[in-house]
Amino acid sequence: MRFARNPNLVAAEMDGDMVMMSIEHGTYFGLTGIAPQIWEALEQPKSAGELVQELLPQFDVAADVLRSDIDAFLNDMHQNGLLHRP
């Protein structure tokens, strides 16, 4: 299953973190830690497995730990309307 960014968001990087605003709802969201890298990797729709393959070389972590973090991010972002399934 692939995920894509909600096109109705405005995002900007600030000191390595990501700040986003929902144009539809006027709400703000902040991404820290690994989340900004996941968000950047989602410039094109991707599955969790594709994200793991792309991001694993950037982090000193086991693939299953990264997959768990990515799954949590995708689920949270989807539930908050920041990602959708194309």
Describe the residue ranges of each PLM region.
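Long, low-complexity, charged/polar intrinsically disordered regions in eukaryotic proteins
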Residues: 1-18
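Long, charge-rich, low-complexity alpha-helical segments
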Residues: 14, 27-86
